[in-house]
């Protein structure tokens, strides 16, 4: 009878060990994966910040409507990264940290299991010793009685630790299920809040892009290509109002001026080319150093 009770307790302890090991394994994996998820989200936020900077830099070089549309888009996209930062902080606090605490919780449960196993082993040892004593000295009542007393003490201690372990594991299972519900509910809530805000921001950003007036900007671009040269037009009017002799003299002056200007431009261009060559050589030397 005593042997069967001991075997039943051992089977129960093994089942509890399996439950604790299962939580230790899977909660550890969940913690690592959720932590990686949060890190990836934080990196996405960092890349988005770089994208915002580049969009603003590009917008500064563009035509008015495109510039305004891109800058407004960048503002909305930057706002989204503020929400993403809040998402990262909430996930860390509400999901990753609670999972981390299970490392300590599992360690405490393993200590409880260890204490129970120690008591069970002591009980099994006393039972074996009693059986040997009965076989070797069946008539020695004093030794047998002493062994029975030791066995009774060990059995009581094992029973007490078993009840404590069973109660502890029951509380552990209840808390585990409650925590799982809380953690995953928090995860879903945080993600829904972020994506809800993201939908609003992306809608505004989309509208900013759609509001870009292509025709107006194209007209601005064309005007920049064919800007009116008022000084040239004024020279033509003045030339038409002069006498033939004045026109001839003016033509010579213009021709001379053109030659000087052309020579000067060529010299300036040559100087710039020389400077560029020097810069290229300097950069090449720096690269090879």
UniProtKB/Swiss-Prot annotation:
It is a peripheral membrane protein. Residues 107-178 form a coiled coil. Residues 265-289 are annotated as: Disordered. Pfam families: FAM92. Changing residue 107 to E: Abolishes ability to induce membrane remodeling in the presence of CBY1. GO terms for molecular function: phospholipid binding. Changing residue 110 to A: Reduced membrane-binding and significant reduction in membrane remodeling activity. Disulfide bonds: none annotated. GO terms for cellular component: centriole; ciliary basal body; ciliary base; ciliary transition zone; cytoplasm; mitochondrial crista; mitochondrial inner membrane; mitochondrion. Residues 271-289 have a biased composition (Acidic residues). The keyword Transit peptide applies. InterPro entries: AH/BAR_dom_sf, BAR_CBAR1/2, CBAR/FAM92. PANTHER family: CBY1-INTERACTING BAR DOMAIN-CONTAINING PROTEIN 1, CBY1-INTERACTING BAR DOMAIN-CONTAINING PROTEIN HOMOLOG. Belongs to the CIBAR family. Homodimer (via BAR-like domain). Heterodimer with FAM92B (via BAR-like domains). Interacts (via BAR-like domain) with CBY1; this interaction is required for targeting FAM92A to centriole and cilium basal body. Interacts (via BAR-like domain) with CBY3; both proteins form a ninefold symmetric structure at the flagellar base; are recruited to the annulus in a mutually dependent manner and regulate annulus positionning. The BAR-like domain displays limited similarity to other BAR domains. This is CBY1-interacting BAR domain-containing protein 1. It comes from Homo sapiens (Human). The lineage of its organism: Eukaryota, Metazoa, Chordata, Craniata, Vertebrata.
């Amino acid at each position: 009878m005593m042997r069967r009770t001991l075997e039943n307790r051992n089977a129960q302890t093994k089942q509890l060990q399996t439950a604790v090991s299962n939580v230790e394994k899977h909660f550890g994996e969940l913690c690592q994966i959720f932590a990686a998820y949060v890190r990836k989200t934080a990196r996405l936020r960092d890349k988005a910040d770089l994208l915002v900077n580049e969009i603003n830099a590009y917008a500064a070089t563009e035509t008015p409507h495109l510039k305004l549309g891109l800058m407004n888009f960048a503002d909305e996209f930057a706002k989204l990264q503020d929400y993403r930062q809040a998402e990262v902080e909430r996930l860390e606090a509400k999901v990753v940290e609670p999972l981390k605490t299970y490392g300590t919780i599992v360690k405490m449960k393993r200590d409880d299991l260890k204490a129970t196993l120690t008591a069970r082993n002591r009980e099994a040892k006393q039972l074996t010793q009693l059986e040997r004593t009965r076989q070797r000295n069946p008539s020695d009542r004093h030794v047998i009685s002493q062994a029975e007393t030791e066995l009774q003490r060990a059995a009581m201690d094992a029973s007490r630790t078993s009840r404590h372990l069973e109660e502890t594991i029951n509380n552990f299972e209840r808390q585990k299920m409650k925590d799982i519900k809380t953690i995953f509910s928090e995860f879903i809530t945080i993600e829904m809040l972020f994506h809800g805000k993201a939908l609003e921001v992306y809608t505004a950003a989309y509208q900013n892009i759609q509001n870009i007036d292509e025709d107006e900007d194209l007209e601005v671009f064309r005007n920049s290509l064919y800007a009116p040269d008022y000084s040239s037009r004024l020279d033509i009017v003045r030339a038409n109002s002069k006498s033939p002799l004045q026109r001839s003299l003016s033509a010579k002056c213009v021709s001379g001026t053109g030659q000087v200007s052309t020579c000067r431009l060529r010299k300036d261009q040559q100087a710039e080319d020389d400077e560029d060559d020097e810069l290229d050589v300097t950069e090449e030397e720096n690269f090879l150093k």
